[in-house]
């Protein structure tokens, strides 16, 4: 009787163990609750997620935990591609039907041994990362993509997520990443659908693309189809070097972006080759497309580009053509251009009605251009339609440039003329904004 009981116990234990590892929709150990998350301990477990995710099985409300450093085993001689979880959800950047909606905690473990080589303009070459699509409820946190990985893909390429509507937090990329076409980011390729957050994440890898390469985020979807912009990049740090083959769109934090960037730092070197069409190069954001919110960011890296080169922002595009304030940003790196619109904080604005104003910003980096025409260069701005507001600082010892404030503190805008077309002029030794035939101070108080 005792032997029979012992045999029954062994069989029961085996059945229970088997149930824990293979009876759920992911074929992972665990039950998917916060107290008993699905366990990811091998490359095979990531493959199991990729194989089993679908529009009806996105992981919504479920928890996943990486329990060990994971080596995929790839090398240059024997490449192993990214798992590209939820790629089936993507038709294009404007049509992302679903994504991974679970909560994945990397446990500060490192992913290694990925040698990704699919970089053609086809289904295999596009939208590659560990996760191709992250849904609105999806969270990926505390995950490290190691330095021995290598990623060369076509577009919207990154280490952690390709297209994201969800939240990426406390993730690190140490690998070099290349996009044969556009939009390479150290942490995420592209934010879509008006939502998506990247918080407290760092990049150490070198990021390259044909156009738009950035340390944290390649870019974000923008346009009139998005009615509410909730994109956020906050407290992120880039240490990696950036460049593009078209000399278009390199930046320390984000390439083409619409939304809020706060308290981010770039220490990477940004160096673009000499090209007549080169544009949009900056320490934080290469080009703001629509909604502009930029506060508390710092650039410490040296920046070399062609035109539209800024310590913080390269260019503010026309976009929604609304007013915006760039505040409390600091540039400490050298800013060097070869053409027009070179600025220590913001290089250029293409807005016709919207006024871009700088407040509480500081530049201590040397700003130069090799262009013969040196009328569109300044220690703070590279275009006269950008307003120098209150409490900005140009460090002592820097050369006075064409678009710097004059000695009496008045910006270089002709009295009551010249810039009236962009709704601002100097009145009584102060910059005044015109809106609907009324005058306002830079702080928004109406002048009667």
Where are these regions (language model features)?
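Bacterial Sec-dependent N-terminal signal peptides
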Residues: 1-21, 163
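Terminal non-domain segments
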Residues: 2-8, 40, 427-431, 435
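Basic side chains
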Residues: 2-3, 109, 141, 423-424
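Surface-exposed repetitive/solenoidal architectures
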Residues: 20-418
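C-terminal outer-membrane/trafficking sorting elements
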Residues: 416-448
């Amino acid at each position: 009787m005792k032997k029979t009981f012992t045999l029954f116990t062994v069989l029961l234990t085996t059945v229970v163990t088997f149930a824990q590892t293979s009876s759920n929709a992911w074929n992972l150990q665990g039950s998917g609750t916060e107290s008993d998350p699905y366990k990811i301990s091998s490359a095979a477990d990531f493959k199991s997620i990729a194989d089993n995710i679908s529009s009806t099985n996105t992981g919504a409300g479920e928890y996943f935990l990486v329990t060990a450093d994971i080596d995929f085993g790839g090398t240059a001689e024997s490449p192993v591609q990214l798992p590209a979880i939820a790629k089936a959800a993507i038709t294009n950047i404007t049509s992302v039907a679903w994504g991974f909606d679970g909560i994945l905690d990397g446990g500060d473990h490192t992913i290694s041994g990925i040698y990704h080589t699919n970089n053609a303009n086809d289904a295999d070459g596009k939208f590659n990362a560990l996760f191709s699509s992250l849904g609105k409820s999806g969270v990926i946190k505390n995950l490290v993509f190691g330095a021995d990985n290598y990623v060369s893909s076509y577009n919207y390429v990154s280490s952690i997520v390709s297209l994201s509507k969800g939240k990426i937090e406390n993730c690190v990329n140490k690998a070099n990443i290349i996009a044969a076409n556009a939009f390479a980011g150290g942490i995420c390729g592209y934010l879509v659908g008006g939502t998506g957050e990247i918080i407290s994440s760092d990049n150490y890898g070198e990021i390259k693309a044909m156009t738009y390469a950035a340390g944290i985020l390649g870019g974000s979807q923008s346009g009139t189809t998005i009615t509410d912009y909730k994109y956020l990049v906050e407290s992120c740090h880039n240490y990696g070097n950036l460049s593009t083959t078209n000399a278009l769109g390199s930046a320390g934090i984000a390439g083409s972006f619409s939304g809020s960037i706060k308290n981010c730092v770039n220490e990477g070197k940004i160096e673009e080759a000499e090209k007549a069409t080169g544009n949009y190069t900056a320490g934080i954001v290469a080009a703001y497309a629509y909604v502009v919110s930029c506060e508390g960011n710092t650039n410490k890296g040296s920046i070399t580009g062609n035109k539209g080169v800024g310590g913080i922002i390269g260019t503010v595009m026309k976009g929604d053509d609304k007013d915006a304030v760039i505040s409390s940003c600091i540039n400490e790196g050298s800013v060097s251009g070869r053409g027009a619109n070179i600025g220590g904080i913001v290089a250029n604005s293409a807005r016709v009605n919207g006024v871009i104003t700088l407040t509480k910003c500081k530049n201590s980096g040397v700003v130069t251009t090799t262009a013969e025409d040196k009328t569109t260069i300044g220690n703070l701005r590279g275009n006269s339609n950008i307003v120098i507001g209150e409490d900005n600082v140009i460090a002592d010892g820097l050369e006075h440039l064409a678009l710097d404030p004059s000695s009496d503190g008045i910006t270089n805008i002709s009295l009551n003329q010249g810039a009236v077309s962009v709704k601002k002029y100097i009145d009584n030794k102060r910059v005044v904004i015109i809106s609907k035939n009324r005058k306002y101070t830079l702080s928004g108080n109406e002048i009667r």
